[in-house]
């Protein structure tokens, strides 16, 4: 299945609206007109998606600016903070997912900043996978590389690598629950 999607990302912080200039001191951030409901549109979403089933193997490829929720890997909060998930809820890049009856894997790239005079080059390559090796046991991992590079005015490069392998014991079938598992 081929899809071409276009939309807009709308965001409103509950309770965030401008205060009347008569009620706040001059220069207060709370009087900023950008807090009004006229400035809800944050980002254009535009992406191409391909979903294909080849025997028992499913393949999904998404490219463009698309919702972060499309990345379905089992990532710790150490990888993606709540504020990143909420305030930067779109990925700008590529996501490839492969699924089998007893395993699933994904790899993606989020391009967060293009090199410029004052803007640093930033991107994140992330991956997650899990495979069932026995009825109660799965092996999995999540990993990322975060690249934070220089700009024309600031030098230096930082590359952070985070890898989280795990064992997962699934007890749900023993007690008739949808989910009951232990990750080590």
Where are these regions (language model features)?
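Long, charge-rich C-terminal accessory regions
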Residues: 142-184
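Transmembrane beta-strands of outer-membrane beta-barrel proteins
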Residues: 3-9, 62-66, 106-110, 140-146, ...
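Short loop/turn motifs that connect adjacent beta-strands in outer-membrane beta-barrel proteins
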Residues: 2-4, 53-58, 102, 130-140, ...
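Surface-exposed coil loops of outer-membrane beta-barrel proteins
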Residues: 60-130, 145-147
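Residues on the lipid-exposed face of transmembrane beta-strands in outer-membrane beta-barrel proteins
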Residues: 1, 46-52, 94-98, 127-131, ...
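Residues that define the transmembrane beta-barrel architecture of outer-membrane proteins
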Residues: 1, 38-44, 88-92, 119-125, ...
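Extracellular loop and loop/strand-boundary signature of outer-membrane beta-barrel proteins
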Residues: 29-35, 79-82, 111-115, 151-155
């Amino acid at each position: 299945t081929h899809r071409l999607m276009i939309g807009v990302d709308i965001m409103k912080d509950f309770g965030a609206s401008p205060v009347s200039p008569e009620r706040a001191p001059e220069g207060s951030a709370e009087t900023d007109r950008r807090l009004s409901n006229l400035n809800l549109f944050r980002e254009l979403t535009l992406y191409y998606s391909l979903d294909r089933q080849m025997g028992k193997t499913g393949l999904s490829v998404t490219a463009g600016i698309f919702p972060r929720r499309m990345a379905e890997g089992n990532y710790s909060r150490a990888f993606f903070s709540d504020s990143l998930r909420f305030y930067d809820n779109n990925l700008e890049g590529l996501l490839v997912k492969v699924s089998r009856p007893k395993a699933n894997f994904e790899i993606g790239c989020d391009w967060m900043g293009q090199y410029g005079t004052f803007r640093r080059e930033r991107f994140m390559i992330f991956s997650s996978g899990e495979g069932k090796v026995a009825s109660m046991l799965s092996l999995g991992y999540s990993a990322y590389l975060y690249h934070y590079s220089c700009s024309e005015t600031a030098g230096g490069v930082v590359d952070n690598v985070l890898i989280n392998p795990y064992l997962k014991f699934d007890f749900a079938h023993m007690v008739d629950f949808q989910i009951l598992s232990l990750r080590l």
